[in-house]
């Protein structure tokens, strides 16, 4: 191993939402002198306005610090940030693969959460050295001894010499830097071998094209070289390489063990896939680095402009977002009810919400979104298999042999007093109980096998509301299972509204249909004629509500008078309403669509 590499440390920070990851990162950067005090009020690594607002890290932003350690040497520390949310598990696994060690940051007042667990196990699989850091010790309710014991019991790593810090107050930061130098091993690699570099993120720059964030494993990369991507075989010429001092800082070359960026006038982020290996086109390595997989969208929904004229703007906005987010997929789609729009695929629910919010915020668009759906496998009687991501494309029941739906294994951590409520919730959502273990007297880890379909609506919200926000939840896809599913159609005034169709489990169809028609009745304004709202499976109507007509009092001018006279006027009014109903069209407001997405919250 070269002399140079002994002074490099690559590490990431693993923490649950709100345990103080971004603040700790800020303090480390400040301590190594890369930021003036003036810049430290904001969370440097969280670029998107949305990230700061929600307090979550979505886009990773690496940073390089130089630290003069107590042994008198200068060390190069590369911090690779990781998003802490379940939707971005693959991204996390790639940034973990780029490191040799991890700081496990746990809130001294809260202890370990389910998502932290998932990421720590992933770090252990990649043989990372884990340094436990117990943060927020300045708070009165902090209980570091208890948290140490929990880290040992739950994760099984020694927490005797866990570091006690308060990122907010700047306590213990020096100790963290020393621990990074002394406890995390230097990178392995050989700069004389052919180039191998792992892409762990990328973003789009208007002038330089798609820029890949890489960890160089073997070899050297410098401007003018021709590089090749393993997964696509495409070749590009490197125009610039550099480091991050939070901002891009060009250097002459990147050598093995270092973390930096490569710009090669790549037009599309799709060509710089996360987890892919870059090698020298003229002297390629034999095999790529392990662990690359294509990112597959799990959740789909239709996004339509509320105003039809915004279609082009929506298309442009999605294309711009896609430049920075290769996991977002979309294709044009039309709906009889909503006009032209797009069918979009996302990694998960949070990803979907973030994309929608960014479209509305950054591009000032007014959007209508349909209920989210997952990919079903439909086995037809003629032997064909369909991947169905849109309920409207479901073939007629006579052609279907059976349908399979995606199943996930969910890990839920809850305080003991809420176990009953959560088990009930999971059973409601067709969960199959796999087991439970007590982490300590007060907390339980539950494992359930559940259909993804049941999680994507509002499972997370229901979980939080039943446990007063104390539960944490993580899931991974397990595969497909046969299930008794049907397509539920909604008819308004006798016409099918395709945007409201959804796929549901047969046992729950009636209950769901009842709720939907009641909800729609509340949200569709009254017209001059009555509007039937029906829910149907195939040709069978299973639920109905009627929005009453607005009517004029035609009897106002008959004082006393003959009953037949009144009847005649009422009959005449009825005739008119009937005629009107045949030609009238019903306006369905955006609130009606939104109310259906929020159905189960109100129990």
From Swiss-Prot:
Task: Tell me what this protein is called.
Answer: Elongation factor 4
The EC designation for this entry is: 3.6.5.n1
Catalysed conversion reaction? GTP + H2O = GDP + phosphate + H(+)
Could you tell me which CDD domains the record lists for this protein? EF4_II, EF4_III, LepA, lepA_C
Q: What role does this protein play?
A: Required for accurate and efficient protein synthesis under certain stress conditions. May act as a fidelity factor of the translation reaction, by catalyzing a one-codon backward translocation of tRNAs on improperly translocated ribosomes. Back-translocation proceeds from a post-translocation (POST) complex to a pre-translocation (PRE) complex, thus giving elongation factor G a second chance to translocate the tRNAs correctly. Binds to ribosomes in a GTP-dependent manner.
| SMART domains on file | EFG_C
The protein's topology relative to the membrane is:
Peripheral membrane protein
The cellular location(s) given in this protein's UniProt record come to: Cell membrane
The source organism is: Thermoanaerobacter pseudethanolicus (strain ATCC 33223 / 39E) (Clostridium thermohydrosulfuricum)
State the family it belongs to.
Belongs to the TRAFAC class translation factor GTPase superfamily. Classic translation factor GTPase family. LepA subfamily.
What HAMAP family does the entry give? LepA
UniProt keyword Nucleus, yes or no: no
* UniProt cross-references to Pfam families, sorted A to Z: EFG_C, EFG_III, GTP_EFTU, GTP_EFTU_D2, LepA_C
Question: Which residues are listed for GTP binding in this entry?
Answer: 18-23, 135-138
Q: What class of enzyme is it?
A: hydrolase
Domain (tr-type G): residue spans on this chain: 6-188
- Taxonomy of the source species: Bacteria, Bacillati, Bacillota, Clostridia, Thermoanaerobacterales
What is one GO biological process annotated to this record? positive regulation of translation
């Amino acid at each position: 191993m070269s002399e140079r590499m002994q002074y490099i440390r690559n590490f990431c920070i693993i923490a649950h939402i709100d345990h103080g990851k971004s603040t700790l990162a800020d303090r480390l950067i400040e301590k190594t002198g890369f930021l003036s005090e003036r810049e430290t009020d904001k969370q440097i690594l969280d670029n998107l306005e949305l990230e700061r607002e929600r307090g979550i890290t979505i886009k990773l932003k690496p940073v390089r610090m130089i630290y003069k350690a107590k042994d008198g040497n200068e060390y190069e520390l590369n911090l690779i940030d990781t998003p802490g949310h379940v939707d971005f598990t693959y991204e996390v696994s790639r940034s973990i693969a780029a490191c040799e060690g991890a700081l496990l940051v746990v809130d001294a007042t809260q202890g370990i959460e389910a998502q932290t667990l998932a990421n720590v196990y992933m770090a252990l699989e990649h043989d990372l050295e884990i340094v436990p850091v117990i943060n927020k010790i300045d708070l009165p309710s902090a209980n570091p001894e208890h948290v140490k014991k929990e880290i040992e019991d739950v994760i099984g790593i020694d927490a005797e010499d866990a570091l006690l810090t308060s990122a907010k107050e700047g306590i213990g930061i020096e100790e963290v830097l020393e621990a990074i130098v002394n406890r995390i091993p230097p990178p392995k690699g050989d700069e004389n071998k052919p180039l191998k570099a792992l892409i762990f993120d990328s973003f789009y720059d208007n002038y330089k094209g798609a820029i890949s964030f890489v960890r160089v494993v073997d070899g050297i990369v410098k401007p003018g070289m021709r590089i090749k991507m393993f997964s696509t075989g495409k070749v590009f010429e490197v125009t610039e390489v550099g480091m991050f001092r939070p901002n891009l800082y060009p250097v002459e070359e990147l050598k093995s063990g270092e973390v930096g960026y490569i710009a090669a006038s790549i037009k599309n982020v799709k060509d710089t896939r996360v987890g892919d290996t870059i090698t020298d086109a003229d002297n390629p390595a034999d095999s790529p680095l392990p662990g690359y997989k294509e990112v597959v969208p799990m959740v789909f929904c239709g996004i339509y402009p509320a105003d039809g004229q915004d279609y082009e703007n929506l298309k442009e906005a999605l294309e711009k977002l896609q430049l920075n987010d290769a996991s977002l997929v979309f294709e044009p789609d039309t709906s009889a009810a909503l006009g032209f729009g797009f069918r979009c695929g996302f990694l998960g629910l949070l990803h979907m919400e973030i994309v929608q919010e960014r479209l509305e915020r950054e591009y000032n668009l007014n959007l209508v979104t349909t209920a989210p759906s997952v990919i079903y496998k439909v086995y037809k009687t003629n032997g064909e298999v369909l991947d169905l991501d849109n309920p409207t494309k479901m073939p007629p029941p006579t052609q279907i042999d059976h349908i399979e739906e995606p199943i996930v294994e969910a890990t839920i951590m809850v305080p003991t007093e809420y176990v009953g409520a959560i088990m009930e919730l999971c059973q409601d959502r067709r969960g199959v109980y796999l087991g439970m273990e007590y982490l300590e007297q007060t907390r339980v880890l539950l494992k359930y096998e559940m259909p993804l379909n049941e999680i994507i609506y509002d499972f997370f919200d229901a979980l939080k509301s039943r446990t007063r926000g104390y539960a944490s939840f993580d899931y991974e896809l397990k595969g497909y299972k046969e299930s008794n599913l049907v397509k539920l159609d909604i008819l308004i005034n006798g016409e099918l509204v395709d945007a409201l169709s959804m796929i549901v489990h047969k046992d729950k169809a009636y209950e769901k249909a009842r709720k939907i028609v009641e909800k729609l009745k509340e949200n569709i304004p009254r017209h001059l004629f009555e509007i039937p709202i029906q829910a149907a499976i195939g040709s069978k109507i299973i639920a109905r509500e009627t929005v009453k007509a607005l009517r004029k009092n035609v009897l106002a001018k008959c004082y006393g008078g003959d009953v037949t006279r009144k009847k005649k006027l009422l009959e005449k009014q009825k005739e008119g309403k009937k005629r009107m109903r045949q030609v009238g069209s019903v306006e369905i407001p955006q609130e009606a669509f939104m109310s259906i997405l929020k159905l189960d919250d109100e129990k």
